[in-house]
Protein backbone atom coordinates (compact mmCIF):
# COMPACT_ATOMS: atom_id res chain seq x y z
CA UNK A 1 0.00 0.00 0.00
CA UNK A 2 1.46 3.34 -1.07
CA UNK A 3 -0.37 6.43 0.16
CA UNK A 4 1.17 8.54 -2.62
CA UNK A 5 -0.27 6.25 -5.28
CA UNK A 6 -3.66 6.43 -3.54
CA UNK A 7 -3.57 10.22 -3.65
CA UNK A 8 -2.57 10.27 -7.32
CA UNK A 9 -5.30 7.80 -8.20
CA UNK A 10 -7.98 9.83 -6.44
CA UNK A 11 -7.00 13.26 -7.66
CA UNK A 12 -5.35 12.90 -11.06
CA UNK A 13 -6.49 9.66 -12.60
CA UNK A 14 -10.17 9.22 -11.69
CA UNK A 15 -12.39 8.26 -14.64
CA UNK A 16 -15.64 7.35 -12.89
CA UNK A 17 -17.10 6.66 -9.44
CA UNK A 18 -20.01 4.39 -8.51
CA UNK A 19 -21.43 4.58 -4.98
CA UNK A 20 -23.28 1.62 -3.50
CA UNK A 21 -27.02 2.44 -3.46
CA UNK A 22 -27.57 1.06 0.05
CA UNK A 23 -24.24 1.85 1.71
CA UNK A 24 -22.70 5.30 1.18
CA UNK A 25 -19.37 4.05 2.55
CA UNK A 26 -18.77 1.70 -0.41
CA UNK A 27 -17.41 3.28 -3.59
CA UNK A 28 -15.89 1.84 -6.74
CA UNK A 29 -13.43 4.14 -8.51
CA UNK A 30 -12.42 3.47 -12.12
CA UNK A 31 -9.13 5.07 -13.12
CA UNK A 32 -7.63 5.77 -16.50
CA UNK A 33 -4.34 4.03 -15.82
CA UNK A 34 -4.51 2.43 -12.37
CA UNK A 35 -7.35 -0.10 -12.62
CA UNK A 36 -10.30 -0.13 -10.24
CA UNK A 37 -10.22 0.71 -6.55
CA UNK A 38 -12.77 0.03 -3.82
CA UNK A 39 -13.28 1.83 -0.55
CA UNK A 40 -15.53 0.66 2.25
CA UNK A 41 -14.98 3.73 4.43
CA UNK A 42 -16.00 6.64 2.18
CA UNK A 43 -12.55 7.13 0.69
CA UNK A 44 -10.32 6.98 3.76
CA UNK A 45 -8.54 3.91 2.34
CA UNK A 46 -8.71 2.14 -1.02
CA UNK A 47 -7.98 -1.40 -2.19
CA UNK A 48 -7.14 -2.24 -5.82
CA UNK A 49 -9.61 -4.84 -7.13
CA UNK A 50 -8.71 -5.18 -10.83
CA UNK A 51 -4.95 -5.75 -10.74
CA UNK A 52 -5.01 -9.35 -12.01
CA UNK A 53 -6.96 -8.67 -15.20
CA UNK A 54 -5.86 -8.24 -18.82
CA UNK A 55 -5.88 -4.43 -18.80
CA UNK A 56 -5.20 -1.66 -16.31
CA UNK A 57 -7.05 1.07 -18.20
CA UNK A 58 -10.70 1.74 -17.32
CA UNK A 59 -13.27 4.30 -18.39
CA UNK A 60 -16.45 3.69 -16.43
CA UNK A 61 -17.90 1.69 -13.55
CA UNK A 62 -21.57 0.97 -12.82
CA UNK A 63 -23.41 -0.81 -10.02
CA UNK A 64 -26.47 -2.86 -10.94
CA UNK A 65 -29.37 -1.01 -9.25
CA UNK A 66 -31.26 -4.27 -8.66
CA UNK A 67 -28.28 -6.19 -7.24
CA UNK A 68 -25.43 -4.04 -5.84
CA UNK A 69 -23.06 -7.02 -5.72
CA UNK A 70 -22.96 -6.88 -9.54
CA UNK A 71 -20.42 -4.36 -10.84
CA UNK A 72 -19.99 -3.49 -14.53
CA UNK A 73 -16.72 -2.06 -15.80
CA UNK A 74 -15.89 -0.52 -19.16
CA UNK A 75 -12.21 -0.69 -20.03
CA UNK A 76 -10.08 1.78 -21.94
CA UNK A 77 -9.68 5.40 -20.95
CA UNK A 78 -12.70 7.55 -21.77
CA UNK A 79 -10.71 10.65 -22.71
CA UNK A 80 -9.00 11.42 -25.99
CA UNK A 81 -5.35 12.28 -26.40
CA UNK A 82 -2.02 10.79 -27.34
CA UNK A 83 -1.42 9.49 -23.84
CA UNK A 84 -4.46 7.19 -23.48
CA UNK A 85 -4.40 3.44 -23.00
CA UNK A 86 -6.96 1.13 -24.54
CA UNK A 87 -8.92 -1.67 -22.93
CA UNK A 88 -10.43 -4.95 -24.02
CA UNK A 89 -14.16 -4.68 -23.51
CA UNK A 90 -16.76 -4.92 -20.79
CA UNK A 91 -16.14 -6.75 -17.51
CA UNK A 92 -18.64 -7.94 -14.92
CA UNK A 93 -18.20 -8.88 -11.27
CA UNK A 94 -20.94 -10.75 -9.44
CA UNK A 95 -19.27 -10.53 -6.03
CA UNK A 96 -18.53 -6.87 -5.40
CA UNK A 97 -15.26 -6.84 -7.33
CA UNK A 98 -13.58 -9.97 -5.94
CA UNK A 99 -13.48 -11.60 -9.38
CA UNK A 100 -14.18 -10.44 -12.93
CA UNK A 101 -15.34 -11.92 -16.23
CA UNK A 102 -14.89 -10.35 -19.65
CA UNK A 103 -18.35 -10.02 -21.19
CA UNK A 104 -17.32 -9.06 -24.71
CA UNK A 105 -16.88 -6.00 -26.92
CA UNK A 106 -13.14 -6.73 -26.86
CA UNK A 107 -12.52 -4.66 -30.01
CA UNK A 108 -14.15 -1.56 -28.53
CA UNK A 109 -10.89 -0.29 -26.96
CA UNK A 110 -12.71 2.52 -25.08
CA UNK A 111 -15.99 1.99 -23.20
CA UNK A 112 -17.13 5.32 -21.80
CA UNK A 113 -20.46 4.47 -20.14
CA UNK A 114 -22.52 1.46 -19.06
CA UNK A 115 -26.13 1.67 -17.90
CA UNK A 116 -28.12 -1.18 -16.37
CA UNK A 117 -31.91 -1.05 -16.66
CA UNK A 118 -33.31 -0.10 -13.23
CA UNK A 119 -35.93 -2.89 -13.22
CA UNK A 120 -34.33 -5.60 -15.37
CA UNK A 121 -30.68 -6.54 -14.77
CA UNK A 122 -30.54 -8.46 -18.04
CA UNK A 123 -30.79 -5.23 -20.05
CA UNK A 124 -27.52 -3.30 -20.31
CA UNK A 125 -26.35 -0.54 -22.64
CA UNK A 126 -22.67 0.18 -23.35
CA UNK A 127 -21.28 3.26 -25.09
CA UNK A 128 -18.19 2.42 -27.12
CA UNK A 129 -15.88 5.05 -28.56
CA UNK A 130 -13.92 2.47 -30.54
CA UNK A 131 -10.27 2.85 -31.53
CA UNK A 132 -9.13 6.47 -31.33
CA UNK A 133 -6.66 6.55 -34.24
CA UNK A 134 -7.92 3.91 -36.62
CA UNK A 135 -11.23 3.00 -38.26
CA UNK A 136 -13.36 0.03 -37.35
CA UNK A 137 -13.48 -1.85 -34.11
CA UNK A 138 -16.64 -2.23 -32.08
CA UNK A 139 -17.93 1.33 -31.84
CA UNK A 140 -21.39 2.72 -31.21
CA UNK A 141 -24.14 2.06 -28.69
CA UNK A 142 -24.56 -1.60 -27.79
CA UNK A 143 -27.40 -3.32 -25.96
CA UNK A 144 -27.59 -6.68 -24.23
CA UNK A 145 -30.87 -8.30 -23.24
CA UNK A 146 -29.29 -11.39 -21.66
CA UNK A 147 -27.10 -10.00 -18.89
CA UNK A 148 -24.14 -9.20 -21.13
CA UNK A 149 -23.75 -12.61 -22.77
CA UNK A 150 -24.49 -11.11 -26.21
CA UNK A 151 -24.35 -7.55 -27.53
CA UNK A 152 -26.17 -5.93 -30.46
CA UNK A 153 -25.27 -2.57 -31.95
CA UNK A 154 -28.35 -0.33 -31.69
CA UNK A 155 -26.80 3.00 -32.71
CA UNK A 156 -23.78 3.94 -34.75
CA UNK A 157 -22.76 3.95 -38.32
CA UNK A 158 -19.48 4.91 -39.82
CA UNK A 159 -16.14 3.29 -39.25
CA UNK A 160 -14.98 6.43 -37.37
CA UNK A 161 -18.12 7.17 -35.29
CA UNK A 162 -18.33 6.08 -31.66
CA UNK A 163 -20.55 6.85 -28.68
CA UNK A 164 -19.29 8.52 -25.50
CA UNK A 165 -22.43 9.22 -23.49
CA UNK A 166 -25.86 7.70 -22.96
Describe each PLM feature range.
Residues 13, 57-59, 86, 110-112, ...:
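Beta-rich catalytic cores
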Residues 81-88, 133-138:
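Short, solvent-exposed loop/turn segments at conserved positions within beta-propeller repeat blades
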Amino acid sequence: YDRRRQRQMCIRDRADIAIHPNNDNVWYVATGSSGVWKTENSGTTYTPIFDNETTYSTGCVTIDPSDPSIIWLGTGENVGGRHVAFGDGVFKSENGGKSWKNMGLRKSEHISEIIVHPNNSNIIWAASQGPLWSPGGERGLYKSIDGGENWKKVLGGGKWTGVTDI
